[in-house]
């Protein structure tokens, strides 16, 4: 169970013990066996010599650490306009990825068609910015198709936007499940979209 305690100034309270908490399940008090303080602010420990991610296995090992924050930037290309909206979103996101994260934060960029086994985490801010510059907005744009799945969408006619919304919801759900498999504790998905429309049953 993750707990964040702040004082009146919005500052973290770090000197609490398990006796300061009460956990209830169905109204019944539960015993607290352990309480662990985790400070994950993206700063690099003085003895941390493994900032560069060398492989997916190394990324998974780093992601499992309690003091490492994990972020996925989900670019919703189906609901971002091709021209000005995409340009503005890329500019804002490029600045964001180069300034918002700490040296130990793990960050990945993906879209609807990125399989979870192709998600790649990095700490290289320039690499992230380069990935962002390659992102495209495809709202209302159906050709060329990027995959066989998208080719099949073309036969849905007026229902194609609903199908795209369902694909978005399914991809988000798969990403949530994937992040949950990395470790206990908090992970973050940053959704970049103009609107995700009617998500359909996958969003329930």
Which residue stretches match the model-derived regions?
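Scaffold/interface architecture of coatomer-like assemblies
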Residues: 1-204
